[in-house]
């Protein structure tokens, strides 16, 4: 919600409900069970959340031009992760066409410049503050479950790249983003 204030904008009422619902953060016992307890413990670092480096990471990605629904989801997701003691940050929200083409050449994405939700502020890549991209499949699956639970609670239509054939577990995007940006089709 602070991002709306920084931009001098009033958040929509439904996003206010998402940002401050009575049942968020979701209790850890409802969020994590079984074998995922070990995955959670392996990515937790509550003391890191209190440090200057974590604070700086939170401001790393440019939020200019990011879809407000996506920012609302990101804010709620981050609150849930902090409540669980998991330090994460966004590597990129908005990405230039040239940067997209560079990543495609490296094989980290399939989308060409101009055809990615990142070019339109409709996606973000979430990275662990200390482990970076190097999480296990179980750790990413846990993060996917947490993010999808937050989205469901807020009735937000968000897709997770960990569910795709081209596995991209750091990636989150607005579902149906092409319909919201007609010239991207």
Residue ranges of predicted features:
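Charged, low-complexity surface patches
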Residues: 70, 92, 136, 140
